[in-house]
C-alpha cells in the first residue's frame, strides 16, 4: 500500500515513515505544502496523511484543491488542531478521517487500512482468494490455514493483487505501488517478487498477461 505523507514536523514524519514502512507500507514523505500537493498528481497513492499546519500552503487549501480537481484518494488529517470547529471544517472540505496528535502509530495504520477498505468497497479487513487469506491489520497470510512466510514486498504485492481481483495490473503500476521515490529499484524487481510468490502459492495463482502485467489466476 503506497501512502503520501505531508507533515512538516521532522520528528513526527520520520517516526511515521519508519513505523509504517516496517508494517509493509510504502511511504513518500514531504515536509512542505506545495510539493506535497503536487505529489498526488504524479503517483498512484492508496491514501494520504495530511497535516494542516504546513509551510508554503495550508493543509486545508491543499485538501480543497484536491477535491475540486477530482482527486478522490482517502485523506487522513493528522494534526495538533483539536478544536471541534476545525475538525468539522476539515471533514467538510473532503477529509475522510481525522486524528489528533499525539497518536499511536498502530492506530494510524488501522485507520489507513479502514479508509482504503471503504474506498474499495470491502466490508471485511480479511482478503481471500481460493485457499489464500491475508489480513493487512496483523500482517498475517495463510495458505489452506497454514501461515505463509512472506517478505514485506511479497506481502504488499499479494495484498495489491487481492484488492484488485479481476483487474490486470500493469507492471509499472505494481512497481509504483510497492516502492517509494527513495527506493533503489532493479529493472526486474516486480518479476522477482512474482516468482517468489508463485513458488509459495502455486504457479497458477498469479497469471501473466503478456505485454500488460499480472492478475490473479483462477481460485
Curated annotation (Swiss-Prot):
Main location as per UniProt: cytoplasm
Keyword DNA-binding among UniProt keywords: yes
SMART domains reported in the protein's UniProt record: REC, Trans_reg_C
Domain spans labelled Response regulatory: 2-116
Compartments, record wording: Cytoplasm
GO molecular function: phosphorelay response regulator activity; transcription cis-regulatory region binding
Source superkingdom: Bacteria
Residues found modified as 4-aspartylphosphate: 51
Its biological purpose: Member of a two-component regulatory system QseB/QseC. Activates the flagella regulon by activating transcription of flhDC.
Name this polypeptide is given: Transcriptional regulatory protein QseB
Lineage: Bacteria, Pseudomonadati, Pseudomonadota, Gammaproteobacteria, Enterobacterales
Amino acid at each position: 500500500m503506497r501512502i503520501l505523507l505531508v507533515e512538516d514536523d521532522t520528528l513526527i514524519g520520520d517516526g511515521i515513515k519508519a513505523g509504517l514502512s516496517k508494517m509493509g507500507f510504502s511511504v513518500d514523505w514531504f515536509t512542505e505544502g506545495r510539493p506535497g500537493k503536487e505529489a498526488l498528481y504524479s503517483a498512484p497513492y492508496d491514501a494520504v496523511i495530511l497535516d494542516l499546519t504546513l509551510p508554503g500552503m495550508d493543509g486545508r487549501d491543499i485538501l480543497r484543491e484536491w477535491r475540486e480537481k477530482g482527486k478522490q484518494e482517502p485523506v487522513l488529517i493528522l494534526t495538533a488542531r483539536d478544536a471541534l470547529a476545525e475538525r468539522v471544517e476539515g471533514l467538510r472540505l473532503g477529509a475522510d478521517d481525522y486524528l489528533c496528535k499525539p497518536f499511536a502509530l498502530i492506530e494510524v495504520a488501522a485507520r489507513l487500512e479502514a479508509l482504503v477498505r471503504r474506498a474499495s468497497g470491502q466490508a471485511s479487513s480479511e482478503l481471500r482468494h481460493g485457499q489464500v487469506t491475508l489480513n493487512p491489520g496483523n500482517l498475517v497470510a495463510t495458505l489452506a490455514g497454514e501461515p505463509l512466510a512472506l517478505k514485506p514486498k511479497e506481502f504488499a504485492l499479494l495484498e495489491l493483487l487481492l484488492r484488485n481481483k479481476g483487474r490486470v495490473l500493469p507492471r509499472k503500476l505494481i512497481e509504483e505501488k510497492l516502492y517509494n521515490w527513495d527506493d533503489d529499484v532493479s529493472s526486474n524487481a516486480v518479476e522477482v517478487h512474482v516468482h517468489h510468490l508463485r513458488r509459495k502459492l502455486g504457479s497458477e495463482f498469479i497469471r501473466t498477461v503478456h505485454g500488460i502485467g499480472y492478475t490473479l489466476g483462477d481460485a
